Amino acid sequence: EKIVVPYNNLGIGRLIYQLPIPLCQMFMKEVFGEKLPDTFDDETLTTINKFFENNLNVSETSRQLYVHRNTLVYRLEKLQKSTGLDIRVFDDALTFKIAMMVVSYMKYMEQND
């Protein structure tokens, strides 16, 4: 099953989806080194996605994940140690989100080659 998204609704994806794959790979190595976002465990990915859905709001994210606020902070700090990015800080969150979109784009391109 494929999802069709109108071009006007892609947002920043319109820029990402025009990047050449070698440039995407270079960006990913700069941001993550060898630890790509698709190598994170399910709990970490769920935490990251929910945190972004809640606009970087720690309290709301912990409530929706049914975890204590300190547990969420611990997970975010663990992510920071492994990636060097503190997604509670807007600039790092933006870099991380773009990197996740680049990973999705690269996977899509691999499947369609």
Question: What residue spans do the PLM features occupy?
Answer:
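Cytosolic nucleotide-utilizing catalytic cores of signal-transduction proteins
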Residues: 1-113
